[in-house]
A protein has these predicted regions:
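Glycine-rich phosphate/pyrophosphate-binding loop and the adjoining helix
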Residues: 3, 15, 157-158, 162, ...
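Residues at the starts of beta-strands that form the adenosine-phosphate
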Residues: 19-20, 51-53, 141-143, 179
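Short hydrophobic segments within beta-strands
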Residues: 24-26, 55, 146
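A short, flexible beta-alpha/helix-coil linker loop
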Residues: 28, 149-153, 187-190
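N-terminal beta-loop-helix "entrance" segment that forms/cooperates
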Residues: 57-78, 195-196
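Helix-loop-strand module that forms the ligand-binding subsite of alpha/beta enzymes
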Residues: 79, 83-166
C-alpha cells in the first residue's frame, strides 16, 4: 500500500516547486532508533512542503526474494518489471530518494537488498548500451542514506564499508543526482542518549537542506 504525505508549500514562496520523495525504510522494529530516524526523515521532508511516499518495506510485507522466473527474465525489458510493477512506478515517480536502514554484518538488511535486486532492473534503474551501464533514474535529483552501524567507522573501513560505496557509487551512478548525502551513526552499540539525540538533530538539519 502506498502511503503519501503531502506537505504545504511555504506561503512566503509562491514559486515553490513541490519535490516528490520516495523514502525507503528497512527495519522490523517499530520502537527502534532506526524507526525514530525514519520518522524524523518523513516529518522533516513533509514540513518542507514536499510530497513523501513513505515506503516501509516491512510494514508493506515486501517480498525480497528474487524468484527463478524473475532471474531468468531479468533482461527481458519491459516484461521484467511486471512482478514488481507498483514499486517500479513509485521509484520512477521519485524526484528524491532517501534510504533509511541499519547496517548489519557490514551490509544492507536482506529486505533492502532484495528491493534493489528486484526493483532496480534493466530498463528501470539502468540501460545497457554496448555492454555499458547507463543511468535511467535521472529524474532523481537528490539522494540520501540515513543509517546506523554497530561497529566503528574504522571497522567498517577495514572491510571496505560496502553500504556507503553502494549508495554513493552504485545507486548514485544510476541517478546522477545533484545532491548526495550519506549520514551514518557509527559505533551504535556504544552510543549514548546524547549521541543518538545529536544524530537525530543532524538528520533533521540535513533533510531540510537536501
Amino acid at each position: 500500500m502506498t502511503h503519501i504525505r503531502r506537505g504545504s508549500p511555504p506561503k512566503s514562496d509562491p514559486g515553490f516547486a513541490v519535490t516528490h520523495a520516495l523514502v525507503l525504510a528497512a527495519h522490523p522494529m517499530k520502537d527502534s532508533f532506526n524507526a525514530a530516524l525514519h520518522t524524523r526523515v518523513v516529518d522533516t521532508l513533509t514540513d518542507r512542503g514536499w510530497s513523501v511516499d513513505d515506503c516501509d518495506l516491512y510494514a508493506e510485507n515486501f517480498d525480497p526474494v528474487l524468484s527463478d522466473a524473475e532471474r531468468r527474465g531479468y533482461h527481458d525489458v519491459p516484461e521484467n518489471r511486471s512482478p514488481v510493477e507498483s514499486y517500479v512506478e513509485r521509484l520512477e515517480a521519485a524526484e528524491a530518494l532517501v534510504m533509511v536502514f541499519p547496517v548489519w554484518n557490514f551490509g544492507y538488511p536482506a529486505m533492502l537488498k532484495g528491493f534493489l535486486d528486484r526493483v532496480f532492473l534493466p530498463g528501470v534503474s539502468f540501460r545497457l548500451e554496448d555492454g555499458k551501464v547507463k543511468p535511467n533514474l535521472t529524474q532523481i535529483r537528490r539522494l540520501a542514506a540515513v543509517t546506523t552501524y554497530g561497529g566503528t567507522r574504522l571497522r567498517a573501513m577495514l572491510v571496505g564499508d560496502p553500504p556507503r560505496k553502494c549508495v554513493t557509487r552504485a545507486v548514485w551512478h544510476v541517478c546522477r543526482p545533484r545532491k548526495t548525502r550519506y549520514l551514518a551513526l557509527y559505533d551504535m552499540n556504544r552510543a549514548t542518549a546524547d549521541d543518538r539525540a545529536g544524530f537525530l538533530s543532524k538528520v533533521g538539519r540535513e533533510m531540510k537542506d537536501l
